[in-house]
Amino acid sequence: MIVESREIKLKHRIPVKKTANYWKGLEEGRVFKTVCRNCEKSYYPPRADCICGNQTEWVEIKEKGFVECFTVVHSIPACFEWSKPYRIVIARFGDVCVMGWSEEDLRVGDEVFISTAKDESGIWKIWFRR
């Protein structure tokens, strides 16, 4: 049995003033987290202010990561209709987890490196590779 559903298209406007370094980093092929100058808590996605009330500093995620979990999406939303089934991966890089995409057949525990690239629609994405 198949039930027809309605098409939903969303377009988000993201305020980026306080996180402009993150978006600029993606364009440069770099991914950043933020770390509190006082309590040393790390944040990804990055945030400008820590919950302890202090400012954070920008730190590039450079080390290797490890796949924590993944899923292959077969039910593709309209905004990704150009895509074939795709793999979403969450990888741990030290004290933060990062969600991204991979074209490789990654498994839990695999070592990965992080990079950025624009997709077919011109949106910057995070990619994982061995």
Residue positions per predicted region:
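N-terminal intrinsically disordered, low-complexity, charge/repeat-rich segments that act as generic
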Residues: 1-40
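OB-fold (S1/OB) nucleic-acid-binding surfaces
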Residues: 81-98
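Short, conserved beta-turn/loop elements at beta-strand boundaries and strand-helix junctions
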Residues: 69-76, 119
